[in-house]
């Protein structure tokens, strides 16, 4: 079976990793993460259930999505803050600064 080149990336605020690897054609996004060995670089990462995406687009079923040559699998971290709540806080600060 032919091999394809893909990348697996993960980033924390203080540390990032980009791993390039060759995988058999038809390998799923989740399997590529496992094959990359990124769990050894970030032992706290649970690669079996973390959300994945490709080039900034989240995957609904990373276990079923076969990769294409050159794709970058991104491992997503949970959000630290609720985006809606952050917007509310920012708006409240802006109102307070304007004196509304």
Curated annotation (Swiss-Prot):
Q: Which InterPro entries match?
A: Mopterin_synth/thiamin_S_b (IPR016155), RnfH (IPR005346), RnfH_sf (IPR037021)
Q: Which domain of life is it from?
A: Bacteria
Q: Which family does it belong to?
A: Belongs to the UPF0125 (RnfH) family.
Q: Under what name is this protein listed?
A: Protein RnfH
């Amino acid at each position: 079976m032919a091999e394809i080149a893909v990348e697996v990336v993960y980033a924390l605020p203080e540390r990032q990793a980009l791993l390039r690897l060759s995988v058999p054609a038809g390998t799923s996004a989740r399997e590529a993460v496992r094959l990359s060995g990124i769990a050894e670089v970030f032992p706290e990462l649970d690669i079996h259930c973390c959300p994945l995406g490709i080039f900034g687009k989240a995957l609904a079923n990373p276990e079923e999505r076969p990769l294409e040559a050159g794709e970058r699998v991104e491992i997503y971290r949970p959000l630290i803050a609720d985006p809606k709540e952050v917007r509310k806080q920012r708006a409240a600060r802006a109102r307070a600064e304007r004196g509304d």
